[in-house]
């Protein structure tokens, strides 16, 4: 068989060093610098042997912070920090007649969701999970796929 291992890592650090007066409020500067996790990684294992194959992918998102935006004081004094998360995806496939492939899999198979939204106004407006989450809030997604190569 053949095993491919791939690791990718992002280190993000945004620093706004100069803001023209009254261009944006301090809360927006805070959000631009902190709403993206400082670290995120993807580790993928892709195995194939003959007609069978499979993929396991582990996604990591570091914690991130945000302000209430329009609903806060605007000076960056009120912030919320949301925790880090690990998501796992899995997929298996079988190829036959050298052109048809049947695949089953799942994304976020442990049904992880972002932390609950801390801002009361956004919660009142219907936001259950952090609206600035770096990943979706719909939980697990399962699928089956049939494909053909011509």
Model regions and ranges:
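Generic long, charged, amphipathic alpha-helical segments
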Residues: 58-60, 67-91
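Gram-negative outer-membrane beta-barrel transporters
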Residues: 1-68
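Extracellular loop and loop/strand-boundary signature of outer-membrane beta-barrel proteins
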Residues: 26-32, 73-80, 129-134
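Residue-level detector of the transmembrane beta-barrel scaffold of outer-membrane proteins
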Residues: 2-6, 44, 53-55, 91, ...
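C-terminal beta-signal and adjacent terminal beta-strands/loops
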Residues: 60-67, 93-150
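Residue-level preference for alpha-helix termini and adjacent loops
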Residues: 29, 81-86, 108-109
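Residues that define the transmembrane beta-barrel architecture of outer-membrane proteins
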Residues: 37-41, 84-88, 138-142
């Amino acid at each position: 068989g053949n095993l491919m291992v791939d690791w990718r890592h992002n280190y993000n650090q945004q620093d706004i060093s100069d803001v023209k007066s009254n261009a944006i409020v301090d809360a927006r500067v805070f959000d631009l610098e902190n709403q993206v996790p400082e670290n995120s990684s993807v580790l993928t294992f892709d195995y194939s042997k003959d007609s069978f194959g499979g993929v396991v992918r582990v996604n990591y998102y570091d914690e991130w912070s945000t302000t209430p935006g329009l609903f806060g004081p605007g000076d960056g004094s009120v912030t919320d920090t949301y925790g880090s998360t690990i998501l796992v995806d899995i997929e298996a496939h079988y190829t036959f007649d050298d052109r048809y492939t049947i695949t089953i899999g799942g994304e976020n198979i442990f049904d992880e969701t972002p932390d609950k939204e801390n801002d009361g106004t956004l919660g009142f407006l219907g936001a259950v999970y952090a609206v600035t989450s770096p990943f979706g809030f719909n939980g697990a997604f399962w699928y089956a796929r049939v494909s053909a190569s011509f």
